[in-house]
């Protein structure tokens, strides 16, 4: 199993991605090809004592797509950008999966232009796992495309169901449409048009509308929405989790001696809670609907997140999620005809 890692264009630079890849090779026994500035990568491999590891190779790329560049234009003009080169390796079957934590827009554009969509898939979707009271809930789309037609939402539900079954190991995952109320008559034009289509899709277990407050309750396993709403939900959740942990810490530190003693007693529990809420524990988000396994990580990902993302990428490839999605999309289309 060989995983390509685009090590350029992130908040912390290549060091965290290279370290994460090195740790993944040690922990999971996979091969990795590190794509980016060869000189920088080689220096980091020497630093981490991995320059002689035969399972780690380097593929030089001289350009980087910055976060503020227009994704489609940059992907077309910067042929030697690390994400474009890495996507080319994926397209040519020189690796089994790709992990990137650079520009999300550039990653999606590279996936579309260089790798291509699964036959029958109209729009890819980013599937992001988030913690819930009952385990993990996947939200999609969380940013691949800000606008979505009802048919795109249906395909997201189908792909999200496959993700929940194969990656999260959930039997008959429940699917919910994110809305402002549970009633079938609630919502904007998009929601009202999407609801009956989901209801009639026999390849998913659709239970109806869910509200924002229901996501973390674990009422459903798959939450379907457009990329604009999904991205807002995701980032709000990340910010809220950090705020809650900060408020707890401040309450303990400012609450006097009893609060501090109580804090010591619950410290192990708080560490467990922090770990469960940490996005790094989930690795990255899956870009579903592309013809090969493609993982998108947070721009601020550190080594731990990259190591976990590589593990997810391996699982994605081993479970042959791409082929299953292709079959499910085709099956759904046949049922409607």
Short names for language-model regions:
Residues 15-16, 31-33, 39, 146-212, ...:
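Glycine-rich phosphate/diphosphate-binding loop of Rossmann-like nucleotide-binding domains
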Residues 13-17, 80-93, 97-111, 122-127, ...:
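Short glycine/serine/threonine-rich phosphate/pyrophosphate-binding segments
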Residues 5-15, 144-154, 296-301:
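Short, glycine-rich nucleotide/cofactor-binding loops
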């Amino acid at each position: 199993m060989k995983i390509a890692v685009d090590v350029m264009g992130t908040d912390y630079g290549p060091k965290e991605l290279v370290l994460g890849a090195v740790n993944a090779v040690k922990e999971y026994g996979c091969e990795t090809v590190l794509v980016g500035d060869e000189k920088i990568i080689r220096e980091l491999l020497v630093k981490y004592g991995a320059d002689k590891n035969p399972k780690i190779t380097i593929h030089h790329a001289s350009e980087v797509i910055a976060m503020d560049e227009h994704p489609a234009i940059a992907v077309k003009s910067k042929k030697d950008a690390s994400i474009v080169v890495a996507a080319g390796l994926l397209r040519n079957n020189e690796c089994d999966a790709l992990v990137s934590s650079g520009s999300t827009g550039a990653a999606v554009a590279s996936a579309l232009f260089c790798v291509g969509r699964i036959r029958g898939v109209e729009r890819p979707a980013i599937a992001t796992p988030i913690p819930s009271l009952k385990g993990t809930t996947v939200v999609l789309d969380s940013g691949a495309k800000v606008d979505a037609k009802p048919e795109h939402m249906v395909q997201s539900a189908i792909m999200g169901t496959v993700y929940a079954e194969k990656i999260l190991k959930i039997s008959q995952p429940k699917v919910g449409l994110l809305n402002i109320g549970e009633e079938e008559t609630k919502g904007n034009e998009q929601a009202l048009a999407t609801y009956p289509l989901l209801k009639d899709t026999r390849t998913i277990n659709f239970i109806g509308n869910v509200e924002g407050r229901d996501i973390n309750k674990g009422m459903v396993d798959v939450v379907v929405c457009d990329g604009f709403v999904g991205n807002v939900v995701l980032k709000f959740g990340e910010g809220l989790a950090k705020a809650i942990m900060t408020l707890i810490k401040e309450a303990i530190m400012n609450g006097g001696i009893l609060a501090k003693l109580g804090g010591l007693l619950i410290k192990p529990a708080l560490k467990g809670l922090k770990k469960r809420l940490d996005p790094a524990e989930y690795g990255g988000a899956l870009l579903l609907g592309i013809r090969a396994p493609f993982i998108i990580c947070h721009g601020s990902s550190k080594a731990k997140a990259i190591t976990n993302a590589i593990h997810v990428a391996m699982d994605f490839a081993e479970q042959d999620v791409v082929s299953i999605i292709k079959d499910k999309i085709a099956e759904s289309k046949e049922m409607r005809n």
